[in-house]
């Protein structure tokens, strides 16, 4: 199968940006009880958000990849979502589309590949081992039912630990938008696979 190495070829101009991102987890953070009334009300609110859009910037570091990109995320359900990654400098664009038969990854140069196994396709084409099906919930600050999570003193999700495919992901919610209490800056890390994502959401639509 012929692959197209998107980030190496098209996002080389963004590498220096990713190198400067602060990828360390915050320390000495205070948390409150999960039974907090304001938090429980907020949790019910975000659980009702089934489809939404988010726009912003993502920085990614792994042993083999390092990049920074603008992104647009459109989510309807676990079998229907799109992640658009693009560079304002090079005009390059990548679309990751999940559909009923699997995943399709394409770019603005006409390259396209599809596979039933979304996880393997994402690893092969982009070099990322990120569970996008879980990212849909992590992005809006909704912890999984079986996740070990903490609530911040702002009465919003502060951090969580979640096991996926035998490895452990951690998330720290650094800041929230004041107008809608939706996440603004998120730090995701997987020490097992040595992956780090820094996400900044500039706009929420739901």
UniProtKB/Swiss-Prot annotation:
One Pfam match: LolB
Q: Say where the lipid (S-diacylglycerol cysteine) is covalently attached.
A: 19
PROSITE patterns given for it?
A: PROKAR_LIPOPROTEIN
Where does the record say this protein resides? Cell outer membrane
Q: Which residues form the signal peptide?
A: 1-18
Q: How does it sit in the membrane?
A: Lipid-anchor
Supply one GO BP term.
protein transport
Q: Which HAMAP family match?
A: LolB (MF_00233)
Quaternary structure and interacting proteins, as annotated: Monomer.
Question: Which family, according to UniProt?
Answer: Belongs to the LolB family.
Function text: Plays a critical role in the incorporation of lipoproteins in the outer membrane after they are released by the LolA protein.
Protein name (Swiss-Prot/TrEMBL):
Outer-membrane lipoprotein LolB
Annotated organism of origin: Haemophilus influenzae (strain PittGG)
